[in-house]
């Protein structure tokens, strides 16, 4: 009996030790990294291995989300997800759309619940929430490429701190191709950013155009039947493709806010109809006292808002209303009348009106409607956000000193200070005013790209280089708010592991270690690569031939690299209307090794291993008569130099994302080509 008791004690001790050891070694999965960060995570043990099957519960809307998810999964990881019916099995992904009150109360409009066990289940009470849940699964999957796209087991109930999370693109001063806007919708969706504002009209600065309003760049980018000839000729959107953009955005959970900016920033309209321009405040201002102004603007908005299927499909339309003169009380009151009129005019078509904050700058007596009006608070001197809250406006936090990008302008940010924003900012901070994190007056936050300096060499690729890290950062801060738990150092390192979006690579990032090698490049040859982004080196040996002007080495949809540029026959490149040249020509019969390197600041040419020329930023000055510098003459016969002290300058950029799509029709012999990226 004693022996049996001792044996039992030994067995019990062994079992306890085994249990202790197993508990000591067993680990639950820590919160995985995604952007925006999950608001909450309960880790479990082990990994989910996908079977390649998905199950849908919830009707047609859920089926549509599932099809989008399957297509994006294929594009991102290269594997098919196929639908199945019946009970899910281990490895299946289940999408559930349930609209009961309890789910709606727990998850809200955009929340979702993700449970990763033997089966992965995404549950939401709205289409938007279901879309966001699939974005999380996609981001988790792509970070496990080397492990077969497994997912860490655990669960989250995730919903945004702010209901509006967005970005504004200035398409008025610089045309942004529709292809990029479509990519931008997908990028924003991938990072759960739900609002894209498209600034459809604006104009350059008069001082860069000889101080002549008639010569100053101005554009309205949308097809217009009401006013034939109004639409910009250097790039525009047809109504049909603008509608298709909005439909695409709807699928991806993104709201498009179109903006027609009046009554300032309106030079495109006064170019078309000069009599509605202000003689007192400048032709970029509409004349608020001219009845023809209201007829014109009414007709413009009406074209895009009327009918059962209007061009502007979304719930919100932005009417501008920023930066008009407040020089006289009478003009302030008329500006307030104008603002109120167009808020109500837009609302008469069933839309919510949005405005730029201006009513502190234009403080007056004329009442301006505030109920259900969205106000973008960009500068507290123009609109005191706490006063605007008191008046009843719904605020969008877009403080210029923190979240405005003006590429290469030398004022505002060229690249946002993402570390400061990540560590210290949320939409509750508008300029120097701090609101409570849950203040219902604040709808959310946005950032913006303003293309102020027309003609400064900035391309869409340059804009994208500035935009994308800001998008990732604002995504985190508008969804997770003040509750981010990853350090900025970890965030900044780990964000690089994520794609821009499924099947989107606007930066032309190559996988680490990838190279393109071509032993002999033949005229007209395709390479299988469209382009290579910043941080590249393109090297080749060339035995020169007599190349006529315009001879192309490589071209893509975005750029052309010339062996002999069309103007002077030098090595150079062109994109988006800009032509940049190296002071170098291909010499007939001469064999050299050339290398071109490029980053976000410069493009360099090396000849036989030595730097020949660096094309970096160049400061250009507007030489205006008012800037003529005069000096006292020392005597009656002394001559006076003609010199200027320029008040206006821009920084011209000469960057290049190198094209590789197709070789040109050249005569030279090109061998030993190697392309790589840092």
Question: Which residue ranges define each predicted feature?
Answer:
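Short, aromatic/His-centered strand-loop micro-motif at the edge of beta-sheets
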Residues: 571-593, 617
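Extracellular glycan-recognition modules
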Residues: 513-572, 664-678
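Acidic, contiguous N-terminal accessory segments
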Residues: 6, 23-160, 353-362, 369, ...
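Feature activates predominantly on carbohydrate-active enzymes
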Residues: 106-285, 292, 298-316, 451
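Flexible glycan-contacting loops in extracellular carbohydrate-active proteins
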Residues: 615-670
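Short tryptophan-centered beta-strand motifs in secreted/extracellular beta-sheet-rich domains
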Residues: 196-198, 242-249, 538-540, 590-607
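Flexible, acidic glycine-rich loops studded with aromatic residues
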Residues: 367-373, 380-519
């Amino acid at each position: 009996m004693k022996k049996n008791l001792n044996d039992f004690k030994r067995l019990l001790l062994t079992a306890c030790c085994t249990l202790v050891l197993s508990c000591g070694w067993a680990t639950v999965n820590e919160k995985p990294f995604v952007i925006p960060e999950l608001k909450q995570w309960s880790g479990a043990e082990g990994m989910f291995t996908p079977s390649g099957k998905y199950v849908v519960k919830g009707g047609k809307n859920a089926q549509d989300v599932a099809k989008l998810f399957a297509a994006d999964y294929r594009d991102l990881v290269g594997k098919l997800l196929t639908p199945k019916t019946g009970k899910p099995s281990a490895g299946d992904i289940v999408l559930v759309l349930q609209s009961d009150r309890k789910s709606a109360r727990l998850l809200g409009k955009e929340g979702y619940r993700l449970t990763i066990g033997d089966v992965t289940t995404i549950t939401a009470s709205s289409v938007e929430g279901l879309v966001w849940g699939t974005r999380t699964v996609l981001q988790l999957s792509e970070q496990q490429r080397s492990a077969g796209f497994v997912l860490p087991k655990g669960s989250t109930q995730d919903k945004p701190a702010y209901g509006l999370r967005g970005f504004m693109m200035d398409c008025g001063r610089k045309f942004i191709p529709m292809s990029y806007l479509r990519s931008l919708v997908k990028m924003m969706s991938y990072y759960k950013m739900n609002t894209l504002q498209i600034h459809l009209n604006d104009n350059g600065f008069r001082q860069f155009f000889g101080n002549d309003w008639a010569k100053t760049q101005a554009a309205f980018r949308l097809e217009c039947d009401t006013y034939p000839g109004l639409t910009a000729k250097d790039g525009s959107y047809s109504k049909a493709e603008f509608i298709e953009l909005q439909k695409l955005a709807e699928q991806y959970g993104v709201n498009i806010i179109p903006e027609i900016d009046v009554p300032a920033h309106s030079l495109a309209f006064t170019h078309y109809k000069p009599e509605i321009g202000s003689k007192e405040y400048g032709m970029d201002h509409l004349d608020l006292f001219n009845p023809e102004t209201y007829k014109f603007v009414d007709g413009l908005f009406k074209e895009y808002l009327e009918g059962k299927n209007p061009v502007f499909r979304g719930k919100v339309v932005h009417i501008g209303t920023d930066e008009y003169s407040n020089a006289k009380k009478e003009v302030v009151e008329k500006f307030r009348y104008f603002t109120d009129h167009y808020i109500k005019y837009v609302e008469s078509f069933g839309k919510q009106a949005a405005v730029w904050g201006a009513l502190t700058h234009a403080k007056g007596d004329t009442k301006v409607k505030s109920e259900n009006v969205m106000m973008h608070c960009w500068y507290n001197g123009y609109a005191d956000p706490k006063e605007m809250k008191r008046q009843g406006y719904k605020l969008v936090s877009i403080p210029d000193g923190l979240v405005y990008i003006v590429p290469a302008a030398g004022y505002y940010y060229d690249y946002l200070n993402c570390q400061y924003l990540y560590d210290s900012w949320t939409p509750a901070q508008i300029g120097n005013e701090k609101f409570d994190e849950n203040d219902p007056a604040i709808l959310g936050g946005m950032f913006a790209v303003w293309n102020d300096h027309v003609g400064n060499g900035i391309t869409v690729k340059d804009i994208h280089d500035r935009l994308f890290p800001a998008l990732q950062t604002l995504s985190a801060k508008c969804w997770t708010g003040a509750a981010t738990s990853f350090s900025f150092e970890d965030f900044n390192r780990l964000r690089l592991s994520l794609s821009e979006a499924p099947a989107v690579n606007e930066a032309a990032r190559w996988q680490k270690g990838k190279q393109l090698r071509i032993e002999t490049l033949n005229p007209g040859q395709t390479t299988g690569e469209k382009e290579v982004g910043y941080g590249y080196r393109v090297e080749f040996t060339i035995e020169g031939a007599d190349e006529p002007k315009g001879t192309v080495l490589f071209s893509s949809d975005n750029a052309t690299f010339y062996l002999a540029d069309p103007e002077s026959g030098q090595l150079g490149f062109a994109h988006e209307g800009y032509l940049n040249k190296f002071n170098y020509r291909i010499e007939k019969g001469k064999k050299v090794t050339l290398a071109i390197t490029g980053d976000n600041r410069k493009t360099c040419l090396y000849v036989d291993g030595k730097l020949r020329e660096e094309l970096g930023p160049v400061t250009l000055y507007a030489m205006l008569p008012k800037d003529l510098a005069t000096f006292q003459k020392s005597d009656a016969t002394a001559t006076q130099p003609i010199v200027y002290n320029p008040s206006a300058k821009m920084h011209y950029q000469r960057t290049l994302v190198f094209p590789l799509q197709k070789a040109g029709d050249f005569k030279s012999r090109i061998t030993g080509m190697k392309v790589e990226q840092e």
